[in-house]
Amino acid sequence: MSLLTPLRGLLLACITLGGQAMAGEPLKLEAYNPGHAAIFPVSSVIVSGAHDAILVDAQFGKGQAEQVVERLRASGKQLTTIYVSHGDPDYYFGLDTLTQAFPKARVVASAATVEHIRKTMDAKLAYWGPQMGADKPARLVVPQVLEGNRLELEGQALEVVGLDGPQPDRSFVWIPSIKAVVGGVVVSEHIHVWMADTQTAKSHADWLSTLTKIEQLAPRTVIPGHYLGDSSRSLDAVRFTAGYIRDFDTEAAKAADSAALIAAMKQRYPNLADESSLELGAKVAKGEMKW
């Protein structure tokens, strides 16, 4: 046997150990969702490494954003980045509070999300501000455009999936090193799914395609963007969302008006919370309301 053989083995072992060291320890997830205590039960997810952290989504009200600040400070990790996954205000109104607490953290979002925010933020604040009272933001923070489709935390990737697809404003975050999905706007659980923003058959087909893509990744963990109660943190949330979309389309095609559609969906899902989302979505679907 050549003397080079054991040397090659030693070299390969060193390369392997070096790669593991560069990758760092497994990332950890902490989800904060205010549930019934807030207008929107939206998820903010802290992704932590050994020393640093990335926050996905910034909450809606000041009080809820302060809860995220407390959790970040308690973690002892340095917040390097806040990533905003969608352009609706429950994903970014809390940036005012978070950027005051962590002024060195960069705030980024996809180009589609930044465009959405810029076009709608003044109208959204005018509508929601009076309802939020002391929880409304003192100022609106617009993220910078994320370059590319990934973030990095201590050598491990957070991939934004869907930016090159038909719905770049409805993407999700995939963390391959721990096989986890932060679902954002595309995944809900234990709640009537928000349908008002997707008003065409194609938009629903594209949404279902995104959910299929999540299933194909076979994640071990899925954190829904909106949920009430305890989340399964699994593909059950993805399957629930897909089933709801299909059922909504089936009943919308048969219903004479929004009242009939609402009744049919309540019969299919008698125990779901947030009926106001169903009522608004049904009115939009049946042409009784513009959104």
Label the model's feature ranges.
Residues 34-36, 58-62, 83-88, 111-113, ...:
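A mature extracytoplasmic/lumenal domain signature
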Residues 1-11:
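Bacterial N-terminal signal peptides that target proteins for export
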Residues 74-150:
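Active-site HxH/HxHxD metal-binding segment of metal-dependent hydrolases
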Residues 47, 148-153:
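Short acidic-hydrophobic surface loop/beta-edge motif
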Residues 25-74, 172-185:
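Conserved beta-strand hairpin/beta-sheet module of binuclear metal-dependent hydrolase folds
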Residues 60-61, 161-165, 169-239, 244-247:
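Metallo-beta-lactamase
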Residues 11, 216-221, 228-291:
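Accessory terminal helices/loops
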Residues 16-20:
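N-terminal signal peptide c-region/cleavage motif recognized by signal peptidases
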